């Protein structure tokens, strides 16, 4: 078969989605020497990927995500490459794709948590974007030969929202990068001073979109009455800037640290030195940073909503993200109770072993082969 992968999100430019595409391609290169693969990239990530084997080739498809140009030009490029199958790793599926395709849907956050606060667009344009999203994803999912989700929770939501046959949907769990499980390096504190970290700290890694509930967490942070700091790791964008403005001049400002984007080495040190990882989201598709925290031996306090209990199992303490008192109680408990902390660390290091990028690639390849036969 000649298989195309829309890898325009490949690498750091695509954040979590970029990592998914990157790890999928890396592992398919190791697993499959029979099929030919065409990896579609944009100029901004063109140099980030170099095929390591002869049956993989990269092709430029420099069309912006979620654009009209993408809808028009991607079908032309796909047709030109004479593909048997295409994998779209996100919901921005060209609705006139001329070939059989599978699609990965990581979450349905725009449907589950619609809010104009999640965009810099005005209310009217947000509504247009919302309805455009529903049309594109609805048409794409109906035409897809198979749909991949990264959790059973997202699969159930997909079936419910779009009335899709559950047999059409396969789950392939993601995995975390990082340290060798059970072989944790000693933490280094050389990077902490540069950010003004002077106390034990709670850690969060990711964006600050409204569904992440960071604004809600900031409301209860000072009520924890713990002599600690809150370290928020994520590229400074409109949403993080808005949070900074919201706390400017308030007492908690001195104990909330925004690191902006950091390198992998610095991020590893921030994980290793933290006392607790917090994940207060209202809704998620997988919750990868929580697994990363576990892999570094960091206890986790997480929301009990959406997919998080499915992914973390008994290796986390859970709270209702809409209940301030419960959030405070659970976070203080895992912060102070050493027996619980050590148990969570042990369970977390075991939990991450369930998830593997190789397993994801194996199952994805099986999906390609099954679709190709039919």
What are these model-derived regions, one by one?
Residues 1-374:
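Carbohydrate transferase catalytic cores enriched for Leloir-type hexosyltransferases
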